């Protein structure tokens, strides 16, 4: 009622307001007040919005009915105040009719008629009618309504205060019945609209307000007089809250008690008096218990034990790895091995299974040491992914030449083929690979007893892009097949032969003459002599040379190779008893880019180690294991003089004392000394780091 009778119009939601009676529905266009833009006024304490005018219309009839009059006559018997209506929608119409009946009962027929006559004969109405009669009847009615609003505002407020007392159900007055006509049934009455919160942030979704019991007016009131809030006088006990405070905003300071203490002597009688003072001072009267229960959007103060922030943001969603783009997941899965993808990741969900089946993971297949690999499996893999570029089937004994032929036929883009120790394969498989995969660049088929020169001839004639070959321990290969490869594959960069007794100096000469891009050459245990090795001096790009166990290799050939091959970085001369200290000294002086020198079981002494430490500034790895003439002096001097040494192999150098090695380990921690005891210690340390613990019970038993 307070906001309807105030001078400042209340901003209500844009909805059609119900008419108060049938007379208003006929005269509404003539009695509607003009809309005015409210002037900006400083914010005032928010008043409790307990209820609205039951007639819901700023018409002249509302002010006539609300005029002050004599108190209602006492009836034959008093009825107790009505209990608060239920909140259900089925009783909305009945609740509205009960409130309307109680407001009608507070007025007498004579009072309403007298009020109407007083207003119609008042000077304010006459002045308004005279001022607007010159324009039009519509403007006359409008001015009359404005005058009525100004004249009856204060009287309406007094009526509101008087209506808070006990009411009787006596029936509507005669004056009201005269204007209304037939009384509609309770079901036909319009349902009052919901109260709308007009504080700041009202449109933001908020939590359910916590309704605390209110014993006075202090819990819900925000105006000038709260009645019975906690002081002796009962007025203004709690400080006024700002009008834009949120409904459920937790207080920053300790909150005031929601209810006055039970021992307060003024908790019963003070509210009415204080409320009357507040109304006369321009404030708002305190609400009754029923009105407080019906006030849906009154300010509620949150309990400190259960704070509620109306502007709380929803909690962030739990991050899900499946929300990443597929390209990122594929990049992550690419770091997994084939076992981890097939046996772990692909079993998580269907999405991961599909990602694990992506074609890029099936370009490079490592099926080594898997006895489940059969011809049928190779056929299925080749049928599903025909873009395989690399496959490793080493130690797969359950397949045959047929599976390799199907794989080669369905994967013409194969670039790298590895099949170590597949003794069941023959020339048929290598011929199929050479025939269907012309882009082949790498062929490693070591330790295949059935491989002959026929397969090598097909490789040399059809695979012109071949760069890396490995035919170690293929005992049936001879110079015939090797020469065909040397003449047909001019882009060769790596060649490794091991224990191929049928390969002689002719093959070495052919590779040296036709393959100038060779960088890695290995003829370990082959029937090669110094006459064939000397041709390797033509290879200017040679960086790694493996001449282990070459029976007829002399020192002059080795020194000549080191002098001419300036890019040589690794030289392996193990198991050559003819290599002596003089050869090692030349190697240390001439090897400008040499970093690795392997001299296991050679005929050298401490002088070779001293020469390496004195003349070489690049050698980082030296292995002189099984050299019986190496002593503590050579190991100590090379460690002291060499600035680049990082590894010194002293395995089975029996003249080197272990105590000396322990001292060298402490003095030169940047150098790794390899002996039997030192290697055992490092192995145990790695085992401990990986979580291994010794079983003391088994050791004691």
Curated annotation (Swiss-Prot):
Composition bias, Gly residues: 227-237
Domain annotation F-box: ranges: 318-365
CDD domains according to UniProt: F-box_FBXO13
Biased composition (Pro residues): 252-264
Keywords: Cytoplasm, Neurogenesis, Nucleus, Ubl conjugation pathway
UniProt function note: Substrate-recognition component of the SCF(FBXL17) E3 ubiquitin ligase complex, a key component of a quality control pathway required to ensure functional dimerization of BTB domain-containing proteins (dimerization quality control, DQC). FBXL17 specifically recognizes and binds a conserved degron of non-consecutive residues present at the interface of BTB dimers of aberrant composition: aberrant BTB dimer are then ubiquitinated by the SCF(FBXL17) complex and degraded by the proteasome.
Family: Belongs to the FBXL17 family.
Subunit structure: Part of the SCF (SKP1-CUL1-F-box) E3 ubiquitin-protein ligase complex SCF(FBXL17) composed of CUL1, SKP1, RBX1 and FBXL17. Interacts with BTB domain-containing proteins such as KLHL12, BCL6 and BACH1; specifically recognizes and binds a conserved degron of non-consecutive residues present at the interface of BTB dimers of aberrant composition. Interacts with SUFU. Interacts with PRMT1.
The protein's name in its UniProt record: F-box/LRR-repeat protein 17
Source organism: Homo sapiens
Phylogenetic placement of the source organism: Eukaryota, Metazoa, Chordata, Craniata, Vertebrata
